[in-house]
Amino acid sequence: MTPASALVDQRSRPLRVLRLSLTARCNLACPYCCPDLEDPPDLLSLEQQLRLIRVACRLGIHSLRLTGGEPLLSARLLPLLQAIAAARATPGDPLQGLQQVALTTNGTLLSDQRACDLRQAGLDRITVSLDGVDGAVVARMAGRPTATAGDSLARKVLGGLASARSAGFDPLAGELKLNAVIQRGVNEDQLLPLADLARDQGVELRLIEYMDVGNRNQWRLDQVLSAAEMVTRIRARWPLQAVGRPTGGTAQRWRYVDGGGHLGVIASISEPFCGDCNRLRVTADGQAFRCLFASVGTDLKPALHCEAELLRLVADLWRRRDDRYSDERQQTTGSMPHAEMAYLGG
């Protein structure tokens, strides 16, 4: 087998990150994500998930992110984390090379007990999503009917942040972050309130450009507020110093000059990072996608019964990878369908 360090795609990009979705379901209805009401049939079993993670580690991944939908809706989350932790502690197991296990959640189900359970089960990092501070805006971004419902939702998310911090997820160590999708004309007025909130909470805020993932959200380019515009607006209130984007990373990071922490911006529309993208996405039912903006995936289930066969399939899939959709967006937008965000797991 080719050494993991030599496994690269057609553009010399290594495989380093696995994003594994546990469910396509969500308890919110964010219009940019459009989650499913039910999971697809034939969800991967715990054994299949572990086999996939083990193979991915053998092929070079060092980071695993568990996503959804809302992953806290999955009854398999804790058993999976516990099994991963046991493997990471076993001499000679490929999962010993796993440097971090992270989770993306909307935070509404992140109680004190849940956060403690996740930490004790071996979770290293949590990213919580909140797209505004004002109740009416939060309601609009989360598919809730009223501003009162939006206020209630925001309180739950902030409670989830507090629970994660109490459970030992340290923002200063990058173990707890806040994500926000920004859509021009919808929640762009929440930039400063969100930044103020994150500074007050001591967590890094990561602002995400509104992306053309899926077909249900009726995305248009004029709805995108660019990362540069976001930074300009925040910098006018709090001076910023550029930190940069690490190779293979998604966020361009900035440091508040006054010591108020860090800010990240993910500019997949205005400043694509296809050139060093190192992520493989696998859905809850075992479809592998080499690009967030892909239209079709590769079904891994026929190979999931045998680790050697799965290793060959994933390695071949990655070697043949030539995706750079964001770089080619102007030529391809509108001409091909995309898999939905909640199905892909972001």
Curated annotation (Swiss-Prot):
[4Fe-4S] cluster 2 binds at C274, C277, C291. Residues 10-240 form the Radical SAM core domain. Its cofactor is [4Fe-4S] cluster. This is GTP 3',8-cyclase. Pathway: Cofactor biosynthesis; molybdopterin biosynthesis. It catalyses: GTP + AH2 + S-adenosyl-L-methionine = (8S)-3',8-cyclo-7,8-dihydroguanosine 5'-triphosphate + 5'-deoxyadenosine + L-methionine + A + H(+). It comes from Parasynechococcus marenigrum (strain WH8102). Monomer and homodimer. InterPro entries: Aldolase_TIM, MoaA, MoaA_twitch, MoCo_biosynth_MoaA/MoaC, rSAM. S-adenosyl-L-methionine binds at Y32, G69, S129, M211. SUPFAM superfamilies: Radical SAM enzymes.
